[in-house]
């Protein structure tokens, strides 16, 4: 069985917090989008950030799964 490198151990120690922070930011963006429903410029900016955060979250989930197999 493959073992974690030092860097992977560091990442494993912080990844749950990273995921939680991303989930919280996504929820905040979604609330902000509802509050700015008629401001299309603001909505476009928020949607771009939301897409980026969702993509980052997906990558963190995949990384979490990989690291959990090594733990």
What are these regions (language model features)?
Residues 1-71:
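Charged, heptad-repeat coiled-coil alpha-helices that serve as long linker/dimerization "arms"
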């Amino acid at each position: 069985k493959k073992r974690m490198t030092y860097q992977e151990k560091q990442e494993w120690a912080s990844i749950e917090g990273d995921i939680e922070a991303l989930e919280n930011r996504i929820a905040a963006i979604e609330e902000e989008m509802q509050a700015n429903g008629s401001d299309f410029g603001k909505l476009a900016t928020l949607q771009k950030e939301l897409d980026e955060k969702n993509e980052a979250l997906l990558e963190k989930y995949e990384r979490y799964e990989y690291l959990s197999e090594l733990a």
